[in-house]
């Protein structure tokens, strides 16, 4: 079931009031930004391959969509996507997730995190509320894969974490970002 435009605006206002708005303009996204990000990722590859903690969610961060999400792709289209970096941000946004799901039980919600601790907590608390996954690396192919798979109506990013490539891709697709 889709989420109405007025519901999205209400959620956007609530999140913006509580956490501040994230600008949708990402005009400075250039080849050099992506090149530098990819180079840093390449330099970090040995750490990512040999440290179990750093390896957590690596495939999801690269844009490889897990089967549990692929199998629900149609159902998740038009979802609300909440992003919380870690435990603190997740704890801040969780009451909003619960309240929204209570008011709109048929709405599809997804939650992404960046850290393993945030991921573990989100999976535990959102078991019956939302699909949980790792936020993609800010590279064109990773962002495209997740945005194609989910086709969200709105992305709510907690705190002020800003990813220029992700922001640009959302803006290009007309996805509301708060």
Where is each model-derived feature located?
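Active-site and donor-binding regions of nucleotide-sugar-utilizing enzymes
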Residues: 45-178
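Short hydrophobic helices that act as membrane-entry/anchoring signals
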Residues: 23-48, 52, 60
């Amino acid at each position: 079931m889709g989420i109405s435009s007025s519901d999205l605006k209400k959620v956007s206002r609530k999140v913006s009031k509580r956490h501040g708005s994230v600008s949708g303009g990402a005009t400075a996204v250039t080849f050099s930004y992506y090149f530098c990000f990819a180079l840093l990722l390449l330099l970090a590859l040995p750490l990512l391959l040999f440290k179990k903690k750093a390896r957590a969610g690596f495939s999801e961060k690269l844009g490889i969509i897990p089967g549990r999400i692929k199998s629900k792709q149609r159902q998740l289209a038009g979802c609300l996507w909440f992003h919380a970096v870690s435990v603190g941000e997740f704890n801040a946004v969780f009451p909003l997730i619960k309240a929204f799901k209570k008011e709109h039980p048929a709405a599809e919600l997804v939650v992404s995190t960046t850290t393993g601790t945030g991921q573990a907590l989100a999976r535990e608390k959102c078991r019956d509320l939302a699909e949980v996954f790792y936020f993609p690396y800010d590279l064109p192919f990773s962002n495209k894969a997740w945005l194609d798979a989910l086709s969200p109506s709105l992305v709510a990013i907690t705190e002020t974490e800003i990813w220029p490539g992700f922001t640009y891709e959302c803006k290009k697709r007309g996805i509301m970002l708060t």
